[in-house]
Each structure stands twice: as structure tokens, then as C-alpha cells.
Amino acid sequence: TKGFFMRGGREMDNHFEVMWDTFRDVPSIETPGVSVLDEYYWLNKHDPNYSLCRATVKCGKDAHTDKKFTLDKESAMALSKLFLTTEEELEDKKISDILPDSFWSTNFWLYWQTMFAFQRWSSALEMKRYLCRYVHHIDGLPDFSALRFTKYNQYESMILPLVKYLEAHNVKIEYGMDVKNVIIETVGDKKIAKQIVYVKDGKEQTIDLVEDDLVFITNGCCTDTSCYGDQTHAPDLSKIKNGAGESWDMWKNIAKQAVHGEFGNPDAFCSDVEATNWMSATVETSNEEIIRHIMNICKRDPREGKVTTGGIVTVKDSTENWYLSWTINRQPQFKSQDK
């Protein structure tokens, strides 16, 4: 049986300035006369997000993280040093190269790794960037009180209104295009995109760019080569190969044009699938026994249409193997969901 699926959830906040500056001009498709930003703001003002149980142990018992970071002095000092270390000093280093062994047993690491999908072998430079970008989240990290969520899944609450807005303004959206390369010309100290190379319907084609064109690309995507399964079929992983994927291949072709490595090294991020992949599942149920277990853990009724878990609930005693977390957003999460 096939149902709904979401590869993950977007953890948003009020300081996604670029995104919200965009959506303040995008009309809601549900409430006439207001913007997507208006909807989002009013919803989270009326129904603020926070978690009542951040982690569990022993089959659903509260792990009592109690909003504490449990950082010892050595870990706290190392974390502060990481925040202040220059990016150049962190290149090609793992988090485990920077932080002490005592850090891995702290609540801070439990919160951090499960919220942002970090592993001990993840990039120390990337962790520093996250620390700097979300420093205002630190106080709300233990209970997700810094986060905001949309009413429905992000496709229906954000992407669909944006697509309808663009189409209403005669923007043509091309689907089914596999972008192979962006030809970049170096003029003095400037890098100028001159041409997009893509494949559509098996045929390689190009788009010539002019001075007023803006080009936005995703140079490497963590969901590239995603595979899907359902209730009776496991995902087919046989075609996934280290270093392969449409966005990664494009980045590699762009990187080849660099004179001094200025377009980065994609191989550093996509050469070990086992270290970077993950599995997610979307479950739809009306089973009363399951709902009772959910209510015992998160102290809220998911059928009320309000914040339920308030973010992920991590099964703390699974972190040595599965790193299993689960979440229930406002219901219904999909407009076509059964009541």
C-alpha cells in the first residue's frame, strides 16, 4: 500500500531572513488577502512550538534531558574554541579531531547530532558554520522552542504557493532537466556564468546566459539519488555509487574549471555513501493503541491539530546503532489525509 512520504522536516526560525523576505510577497493559497509569511507568523504565535519530551529510554520512558547541556569544562572549552577557530584551520578535519571524548556523552551532542544530522566523522568546518549560524538557537536547542513549523508539509504550505505565484507572473518552470555543467568564465577577479549545459529527453542542450541573468545552483545535495520503498517493497540501493549523483556530477564539472581550486572539492563530501546516507519512513495510522503511546510520551493529543511532539523525539538508547528519532507535526500534515 502506498501512502504519503516526507524525506525529512524543515526546522525553521524567525531569522531565515532571505526566505521570509521572499514569502512575505507570496500570497497564501488557503487564506485570501494574506501572505504565506502572515499565515506562518500567526500560526506560530497562536500555537508556539516546544517539546515536552526531547528523548526517551527503555521503550518510551522520558530520558529527562531536562533542558540541560551536561557539558563538562573540557567539552565546553573545546566547543568555544571551535566557534572561534578560523575556517582555514578546520579544513579536512572531522569533528572527532577537534572535540574530546567526553563530549560524545553530553546532552548537547545528543541535541546537536540529531537536530542537524551530524556524525562524529562529519566536517568540523561545517559544525563551526552551524554554530555561528544558529548561535541564537542555543538557548532553545534542548526543547526546540526556537523553532517554527508550517501548518502542512512544506510542499503544500510553501512550495505550492510559490509555484502558483511565479506561474501567475508568467515565469516558465522547466522540469525533467538534468543540469550537467555551468560554464564559468574568469574575467579578472570575477567569475561569470556564461552557459548552462543540460540534458532533457536524452538530448544535450544549452542555455546561453546574458549579463542580467542570475544563476542559482545546488552544488551537491544530501538527498541526491534518493530511493523509495513502500509497505511491500524495500528501496533499491543497487544503483547508488560513491561519488555519483546529478548535483555532484555537476559540481565536479564546475570544479574542473577552477584555476586554483576556488570552486571547492566535491569528492570530499560524496565519496563515502555509508558515512552519509540515512533512512526515513513516513507512517500513517489511526491505531488507538499507538496514539495512546504517543500521548504518553509527548503529553499532547495529535488529533487536536496543534503542535504534538514539537520536534524530534530521540530514542536515546538507539544512538550507538540507529540514531532513531521520530516526530509528529501538526495534523493533518497533508491536506488529503483522512480525518
Language-model features: where?
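Helical element adjacent to the flavin cofactor pocket in flavoenzyme catalytic cores
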Residues: 132-214, 219-220, 232-233, 238-240
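Rossmann-like flavin
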Residues: 28-136, 148
